[in-house]
């Protein structure tokens, strides 16, 4: 039989490179030595970074990179957020300015109520918008301009959509309608010097048949440059605004709603020059973004390597357990080798890398995908901060939240599935029955938002008070509907949900005091009594452990 000390040393020296092969014909002593080697290998795998340092002197590179990455990604997000705020503010302020410029008598927060009720008001509104468009250069306080198409400037398109044929006689309760929709359009050039008079004198040659009319649309394009970014050491962007003023008569109710939609696109300015050091600052920011990408790549490689090693060790342990004990490893034990925190960090690294590349392209004015970039960077930063919880979980006093969430998650998911069925039932019922009589129930999305607010105790009285009383039956139903929903979800479902979390929390606290239930995997590892600083985990080429370590317990 081989010398036991030699066999142990051989297995220990190569335990991170290739697995020790187990043969059923091995002698009992060799089998015990192989079991001991497997236990040490598993115990080292599940150690925290501090214990691994004491076991083999391995530096916690992943932890150091995560700390560095948190600082860098957060700084990057803040800088991009400030830039994105200027972009969003410029869009919103221009949209408000256009509404005041092109909608006659418009006042702030009138979007839902802005409408006209007479034919003369419709003509007045159209003529007012056209006149303002033709005089834009003289009246606008912004740097707005017409879009140039070659030597000419883009025109305003006025289109009306109407039924092909229609004879409507409400007095006789008769009508003859052809639902086929036709469209007529004509253009108004910015360089036209024509005078637009009163509706009876207007030279637009626009005639509307209000009985057949569906919509009138005024569409035109304007351009502007966001100069406020210069003060923040950034290159300005050029904006294209596609404006559409819509007169909506689809309901034929005597009320024509007017709305202004602004479709905004950001483009790279063609010919620009800025004095000063703005371009140099842009280069510094791109260098910083490149450093963020390199840091995330290092984190990605280290975490991916750890995940792969975990899968390899999982397969090795499954084979070992099957050959040695003639038993299969349970699925829960196999899942312990898959570190979900590493997978989350890998996802955050990928999002950060893609977002940083987009940010660099935006700074170079090659792309203008601010919204996509903000979603990527925002999500990645959130995941980076969540990933740090893993390292706090190594301390018994800080991992209570993590353990509670992990233990409660399966029951919470099952509970939420059942509660969601009741919630959706109330959503559909409220939308169908109360939608015509209550503004908060006009769409499924608004119904869901309203009911979720009620669960949290928000806006209860106004939800009751705003219910129209035109139909006593529906009003009575609304009371039964709202009272039953509030009672069911607040006093029963929400209380049960909180009790579910509380029960799990108490169970975890009990486990921390008396010990957690041990699985087959943990029982197998627990038979290894070697401490991390015993020296038995060290490989032949490992450096001696430093006596100075902040992780010493």
Curated annotation (Swiss-Prot):
PTM note: N-glycosylated.
Q: Where is this region: Interaction with phosphoinositides?
A: 52-62
Segments dipping into the membrane but not crossing it run 444-464
Which ranges of the sequence are coiled-coil?
none
Report the catalytic activity.
Ca(2+)(in) = Ca(2+)(out); Mg(2+)(in) = Mg(2+)(out); K(+)(in) = K(+)(out); Na(+)(in) = Na(+)(out)
Q: Where is this motif: Selectivity filter?
A: 456-459
Principal subcellular localisation of the protein:
membrane
Give the GO cellular component terms, alphabetically.
Answer: autophagosome membrane; cytoplasm; early endosome membrane; late endosome membrane; plasma membrane; stereocilium membrane
Q: Does the keyword Disulfide bond apply?
A: yes
Site (Interaction with phosphoinositides) residue list: 305
Q: Which residues lie on this side of the membrane: Cytoplasmic?
A: 1-62, 305-341, 393-414, 498-553
> Any inhibitors or activators noted?
Channel activity is activated by PtdIns(3,5)P2 (phosphatidylinositol 3,5-bisphosphate). Inhibited by lumenal H(+) and Na(+). The channel pore shows dynamic behavior and undergoes spontaneous, Ca(2+)-dependent modulation when conducting Ca(2+).
Its localization reads: Early endosome membrane; Late endosome membrane; Cytoplasmic vesicle, Autophagosome membrane; Cell projection, Stereocilium membrane
Q: Which residues lie on this side of the membrane: Extracellular?
A: 84-283, 363-371, 436-443, 465-475
The glycosylation sites are 138, 205
Assigned keywords, A-Z: Cell membrane, Cell projection, Cytoplasmic vesicle, Disease variant, Disulfide bond, Endosome, Glycoprotein, Ion channel, Ion transport, Lipid-binding, Membrane, Transmembrane, Transmembrane helix, Transport
Q: How does it sit in the membrane?
A: Multi-pass membrane protein
CDD domains per UniProt: ELD_TRPML3
Question: Record's superkingdom?
Answer: Eukaryota
User: What's the stated role of this polypeptide?
Assistant: Nonselective cation channel probably playing a role in the regulation of membrane trafficking events. Acts as a Ca(2+)-permeable cation channel with inwardly rectifying activity. Mediates release of Ca(2+) from endosomes to the cytoplasm, contributes to endosomal acidification and is involved in the regulation of membrane trafficking and fusion in the endosomal pathway. Also permeable to Mg(2+), Na(+) and K(+). Does not seem to act as mechanosensory transduction channel in inner ear sensory hair cells.
Domain comment in the entry: The most N-terminal extracellular/lumenal domain (referred to as I-II linker or polycystin-mucolipin domain) contributes to a structure with a four-fold rotational symmetry in a tetrameric assembly; the structure contains a central highly electronegative pore with a 14 A diameter. The pore is critical for Ca(2+) and pH regulation. The protruding structure formed by the I-II linkers may contain all the interaction sites with lipids and proteins in the endolysosomal lumen.
How does the annotation summarize its subunit structure?
A: Homotetramer. Can heterooligomerize with MCOLN1; heteromeric assemblies have different channel properties as compared to the respective homooligomers and may be tissue-specific. May heterooligomerize with TRPV5 to form a functional distinct ion channel. Interacts with GABARAPL2.
- Which family does the record assign? Belongs to the transient receptor (TC 1.A.4) family. Polycystin subfamily. MCOLN3 sub-subfamily.
Q: What is this protein called?
A: Mucolipin-3
Species the sequence originates in: Mus musculus (Mouse)
Gene behind this protein: Mcoln3
């Amino acid at each position: 039989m081989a010398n036991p000390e030699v066999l142990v040393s051989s297995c220990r020296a190569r335990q991170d490179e290739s697995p020790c092969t187990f043969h059923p014909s091995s002698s009992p002593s060799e089998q015990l030595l192989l079991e001991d080697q497997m236990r040490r290998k598993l115990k080292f795998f599940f150690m925290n970074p501090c214990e691994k340092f004491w076991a083999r002197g391995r530096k916690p590179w992943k932890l150091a990179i995560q700390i560095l990455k948190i600082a860098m990604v957060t700084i990057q997000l803040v800088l991009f957020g400030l830039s994105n705020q200027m972009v969003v503010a410029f869009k919103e302020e221009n949209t408000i300015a256009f509404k005041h410029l092109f909608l006659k008598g418009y006042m702030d927060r009138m979007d839902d109520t802005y409408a006209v009720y007479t034919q003369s008001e419709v003509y007045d509104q159209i003529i007012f918008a056209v006149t303002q468009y033709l005089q834009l250069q003289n009246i606008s306080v912004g740097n707005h301009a017409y879009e140039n198409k070659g030597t000419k400037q883009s025109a305003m398109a006025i289109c009306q959509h109407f039924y092909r044929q229609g004879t409507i006689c409400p007095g006789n309760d008769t009508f003859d309608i052809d639902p086929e929709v036709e469209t007529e359009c004509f253009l108004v050039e910015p360089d036209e010097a024509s005078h637009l008079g009163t509706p009876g004198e207007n030279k637009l040659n626009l005639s509307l048949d209000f009985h057949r009319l569906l919509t009138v649309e005024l569409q035109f394009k304007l351009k502007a440059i966001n100069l406020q970014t210069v003060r923040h050491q950034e290159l300005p962007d050029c904006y294209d605004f596609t404006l559409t003023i819509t007169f909506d008569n689809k309901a034929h109710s005597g009320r024509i709603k007017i709305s202004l939609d602004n479709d905004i696109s950001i483009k790279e300015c063609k010919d620009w020059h800025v004095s000063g050091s703005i371009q140099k600052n842009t280069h510094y920011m791109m260098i910083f973004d490149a450093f963020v990408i390199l840091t995330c790549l290092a984190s990605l490689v280290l975490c991916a390597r750890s995940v792969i090693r975990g899968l390899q060790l999982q397969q090795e342990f499954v084979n070992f357990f099957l050959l040695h004990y003639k038993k299969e490893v349970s699925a829960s034990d196999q899942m312990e080798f898959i570190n979900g925190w590493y997978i989350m960090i890998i996802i955050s690294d990928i999002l950060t890398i893609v977002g940083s590349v987009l940010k660099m392209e935006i700074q170079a004015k090659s792309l203008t995908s601010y919204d996509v970039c903000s979603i990527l960077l925002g999500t990645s930063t959130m995941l980076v901060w969540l990933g740090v919880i893993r390292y706090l979980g190594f301390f018994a006093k800080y991992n209570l939240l993590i353990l509670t969430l992990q233990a409660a998650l399966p029951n919470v998911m099952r509970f939420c599935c059942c509660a969601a069925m009741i919630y959706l039932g109330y959503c559909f019922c409220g939308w169908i029955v109360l939608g015509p009589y209550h503004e908060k129930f006009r769409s499924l999305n608004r119904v869901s938002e309203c009911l979720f607010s009620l669960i949290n105790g928000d806006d209860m009285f106004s939800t009751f008070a705003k219910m129209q009383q035109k139909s006593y039956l529906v009003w009575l139903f609304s009371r039964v509907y709202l009272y039953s929903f509030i009672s069911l979800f607040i006093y029963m479902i929400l209380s049960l949900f909180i009790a579910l979390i509380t029960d799990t929390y108490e169970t975890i606290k009990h486990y921390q005091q008396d010990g957690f239930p041990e699985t087959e995997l943990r029982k197998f590892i627990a038979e290894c009594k070697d401490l991390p600083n015993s020296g038995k985990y060290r490989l032949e080429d490992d450096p001696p452990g430093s006596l100075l370590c902040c992780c010493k317990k």
